[in-house]
């Protein structure tokens, strides 16, 4: 253990330290209520094998076998336990930790009730072709989000039917409509986004899962796991036969901090603060330059009218919102589906080559007004995902539940069909991976989802920032539908370019 600690490497930058390097800013935090796969050449050690055995598991549901993408399972069996121990020590020393929900004092006493974030033991090999494609798309999606957000009529018309059956989206649209009536202009616009993708095993295409425009979380943990993997490979370069520099560095935390600092600078008031909306607390007397919504994307974040009044007050203010109500609405699933329709991208993007690049990554997306697609989904539910207008994970509907939901909605002639969209289910390549949670290593047939963070800052006609800024790689068992790290399904991972 001491040896592992001695080799643990440098501490990855925290959000606070990165923000500090950009500019010294006062920050106010407001709290909200509530607080395949080929069989690997290595054999799992006893601690891993006891959990899942040593035979390569069967691919179920989520993935298809591919040699193009997979975890770099090249360590001798005797090394795996040593790597696990070193990784756990490094995580505790360098802040790659999360709150332990099972600990009674977690979140109540500083430094108490923490455990390592779940992580893959080795990085995921990932084709440079897909990486370059996602990086190239990032500024295009940043620009697209901003342009769509400026078309208030498009947002209102596209989401009009959804509003009738989805009260949460309806409340957001009401605030947006009030801003339109007031002719409220957002001269300075800040967007921190994440576009999530999977590689479709059937077509070898990188397809977009969703575009997130609010509370694009896990950038700090994503940076940490990259440093963890680089450190492990650096310490065992000879045994692993890998180059630590092939693990793609992750600058998400620093670049997002720079974007927030840049927005603060554009506000041009040295006494102003950055307001981070998380949970209940109130501060008065300070001008607010930037409001960052870490919360506010689910109905649970608005338990009373007080929260809705606060959201309206923020939108009416001169503060730079991240996201503004319009940027927030652009991230809804219905808008994603509408943008995939023929000739809609042309409404917002001018360059034909850029339009084709964006369109190429769209998976199949349909409204439930399309009866033939609905019938196809009822007959073959395993090929589709039913998505409501919700963020935060755990909301999508799959398999038999999808079929039953559609049959029920069709039978009732329910207007609630407008609350959902159908999406082509993506089947990414599966590979055998070592995954570590709660100090225990297991061997699983797994698939990955890859997200690219983006930052966009504009003041009227002047684009100040339009960048790709880091990434998030999440790996989960191929048999699972959901993929949230915090929810307990997925594991943090990094990219090893091949």
PLM region spans:
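Preference for protein termini
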Residues: 2-498
